[in-house]
Amino acid sequence: MSKKINGFEVLGEVAWLWASSPLHRKWPLSLLAINVLPAIESNQYVLLKRDGFPIAFCSWANLNLENEIKYLDDVASLVADDWTSGDRRWFIDWIAPFGDSAALYKHMRDNFPNELFRAIRVDPDSRVGKISEFHGGKIDKKLASKIFQQYHFELMSELKNKQNFKFSLVNS
């Protein structure tokens, strides 16, 4: 018999990881709700534990192109329905405050062997963001590159029509 997942328990464990992360602890509490609750509701997260204690967490949203643009324009703009709107996977959160990022990375590559993910990576000092690409451990690298190129082409084609696109990393 499998144990039913308690969303409040997961939220508490993720909140503890946020508080333990030098980057996340500086963010407003509203971002915890925006970034974590939809992930729990849609079961689009991984929470790694060691000896019963949380050590790492990541969440992702499966966006359509419209919501991808919305997310890049304002990372705090996604609502619950956006998280399951398409097949363009974005890591929303990646938290490993105790040095377990490699374990989380391996878990994701092993458990999502044919999947593609992208993420906004922010340098905490300069606050400069960039889009990074990740793929599962079994997908052909050339195929992954081709799909990522197609994603970028579609994204850039749509952005040409956006007059007020600002690529915001935090709420103003």
UniProtKB/Swiss-Prot annotation:
Changing G12E: Abolished homodimerization. It is found in: Cytoplasm. Its main location: cytoplasm. The active site is at H24, D93. It holds the Pfam family HlyC. GO terms for biological process: killing of cells of another organism; toxin metabolic process. One of its GO terms (molecular function) is protein homodimerization activity. Its EC number is 2.3.1.-. Changing H24A: Strongly reduced protein-lysine acyltransferase activity. InterPro entries: RTX_toxin-activating_protC_bac. Keywords: Acyltransferase, Cytolysis, Cytoplasm, Hemolysis, Transferase. Changing C58A: Does not affect the protein-lysine acyltransferase activity. Changing A19E: Does not affect homodimerization. It catalyses: a fatty acyl-[ACP] + L-lysyl-[protein] = N(6)-(fatty acyl)-L-lysyl-[protein] + holo-[ACP] + H(+). The keyword Transmembrane helix does not apply. It is an enzyme of class 2 (transferase). GO terms for cellular component: cytoplasm. Protein-lysine acyltransferase that catalyzes fatty acylation of the protoxin, thereby converting it to the active toxin. Homodimer. Belongs to the RTX toxin acyltransferase family. This is RTX-I toxin-activating lysine-acyltransferase ApxIC. It comes from Actinobacillus pleuropneumoniae. The lineage of its organism: Bacteria, Pseudomonadati, Pseudomonadota, Gammaproteobacteria, Pasteurellales.
